[in-house]
């Protein structure tokens, strides 16, 4: 592919549309190289957003968008909604829907369309009610009002989950198979074809937020990190997502590749048994004190991880760097605890 360096995307943040990020790279593309091939993990079995966690794939493919999205500090920022406010009763939220947005079929995004989409989600997904419960949703022009059964101070944030992506429900009523063909959304891409092994997308010419970077995107499912790395090296794909720490060094010093690193929201942790001798809390504490997390992060994970000190990662703005870690690496403490227990 001329004019485009190979790209390696390591990690993925919540709410990030992969294809939107890739599109920013397309400064020099032409009609002869307007197809992007992305090696990725198999995201979904179908494109039905309410099934399992498949809505994440729809958003990652650049097909669906939500009312809000998150910035680098995980704060809610406008997306399909331009603003929102909470009523004095603490139960009523009013969202102003972006007047410039169209669905990929050309239909205008209205508050009524958002209402219908959210109601469909709640009707088809039991998981939706684990976020919040509403008593009434009303629409008036571009104003959407949601009344909830109790106070949800962070309702806009909850609506940023991919489960609540907004789709044109009239397409389904007119015979579209959402699971196979994907929803009609507001994102920069539209599904051309989809199987568990491969997704093909085309540019949404009705996209409201600028022209998408590539006319077509092909996403073969390559679940093994090493195989994804090999596909990138061989030129079978132009970009690979979530390359493992073991393959990271292959590309690190190669000028033919561009590495995009993003702070993840995920933790890697080990569950400790509390049975048998490990019922003793001092023995468990000794094992924890003997765990050199800094060394694991540096040597096993090739500096692509940071040593954990809390369940929440430092990418979430909860004062991670100010935490006092009572379980930090301390060999002498481990020895003392073991000695105490004989």
Each language-model region and where it sits:
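Short, low-complexity disordered leader/linker segments with a strong preference
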Residues: 1-36, 49, 75
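Ligand-site clamp/hinge motif
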Residues: 205-250
């Amino acid at each position: 592919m001329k004019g485009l360096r190979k790209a390696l995307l390591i990690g993925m943040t919540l709410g990030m549309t992969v294809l939107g990020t890739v599109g920013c790279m397309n400064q020099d593309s032409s009609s002869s190289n307007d197809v992007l091939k992305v090696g990725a993990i198999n995201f979904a079995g179908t494109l039905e957003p309410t099934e399992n966690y498949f809505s994440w794939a729809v958003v990652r493919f650049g097909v669906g968008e939500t009312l809000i999205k998150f910035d680098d500090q995980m704060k809610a920022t406008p997306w399909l909604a331009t603003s929102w406010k909470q009523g004095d009763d603490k139960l009523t939220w009013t969202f102003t829907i972006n007047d410039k947005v169209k669905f990929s079929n050309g239909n205008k995004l209205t508050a009524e369309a958002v209402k219908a989409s959210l109601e469909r989600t709640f009707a088809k997904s039991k998981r939706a009610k684990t976020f919040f419960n509403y008593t009434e949703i009303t629409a008036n022009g571009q104003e959407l009002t949601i009344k909830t059964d109790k106070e949800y101070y962070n309702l806009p944030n909850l609506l940023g989950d991919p489960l609540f992506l907004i789709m044109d429900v009239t397409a389904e009523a007119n015979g579209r198979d959402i699971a196979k063909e994907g929803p009609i959304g507001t994102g920069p891409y539209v599904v051309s074809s989809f199987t568990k092994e491969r997704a093909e997308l085309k540019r949404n010419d009705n996209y409201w937020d600028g022209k998408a970077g590539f006319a077509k995107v092909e996403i073969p499912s390559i679940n093994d990190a090493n195989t994804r790395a090999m596909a990138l090296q061989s030129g079978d794909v132009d970009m690979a997502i979530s390359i493992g720490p073991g393959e990271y060094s292959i590309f690190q010093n190669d000028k033919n590749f561009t590495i995009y690193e993003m702070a993840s929201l995920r933790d890697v942790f080990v569950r400790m048994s509390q049975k048998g001798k490990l019922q003793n809390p001092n023995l468990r504490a000794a094992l924890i004190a003997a765990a050199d997390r800094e060394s694991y992060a540096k040597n096993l994970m090739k500096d692509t991880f940071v040593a954990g000190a809390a369940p929440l990662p430092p990418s979430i703005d909860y004062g991670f760097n100010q935490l006092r870690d009572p379980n930090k690496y301390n060999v002498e403490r481990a020895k003392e605890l073991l000695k105490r227990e004989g």
